[in-house]
Amino acid sequence: SMPGAPFLYYGDEIGMRYVENLHSVEGGYGRTGSRSPMQWDHSTNAGFSAAPKEKLYVKQDEATDRPTVEAQMADPDSLYHEIRKLIDIRQAHSALQSRGEIEFVYAEEKQYPLAYLRSDDKEKILVIINPADREVSFDGDCAVKEALYTFGGEATFAGGKVTVPGGSAGFYLL
């Protein structure tokens, strides 16, 4: 929801994990664990290659619960589908795109939440992110038309206060 071009490193969309203790290949400088092969399915080598495991250039996450593209696509509540929702919302709302303006509404040092307004000549969208494990509030008088997206609970807007559940995020059309 920030200005600029969004990006995902391969595997982010399915929640691929950092694989510990992988041998650095070609000067990976400790980042090799982030560069393991894509995990397509639960077949041999996660569908990446039919080669014997010892022939793989970089080893894979061998955990039985490793996320795969196949499993994520089949689960409507998966991270993959959550990211698809976010992409669709960004594409549908010009204020969230690269040319949308940004104005910070609440951004206090060592405090949550982070709240900012994304706007253009067509719309205004309030973005609120609260990674804290507790509910937080800030002063704000907002006339919300619609919650475009919420994760972890919806903020409430009453009496000049915005109250945000712990571990939540939301996009609110004003």
What are these regions (language model features)?
Residues I128-I129, A155:
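A conserved amphipathic helix/loop scaffold
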Residues S1-I125, P131-V136:
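Loop/helix patches that line or flank the sugar-binding groove of alpha-linked glycan CAZymes
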Residues S49-A50, F151-G152, V164:
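Short, surface-exposed secondary-structure junctions/capping segments
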Residues E135-G153:
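Beta-strand-rich binding/interaction modules
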Residues E103, E135-D139, T156, K161-T163:
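Ser/Thr- (and often Asn-) enriched beta-sheet segments in non-cytosolic proteins
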Residues A158-L174:
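C-terminal beta-strand-rich structural cap/linker in extracellular carbohydrate-active enzymes
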Residues N45-A46, G153-T156, A169:
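A short acidic, often aromatic-flanked loop/helix-cap motif at beta-alpha or helix-coil junctions
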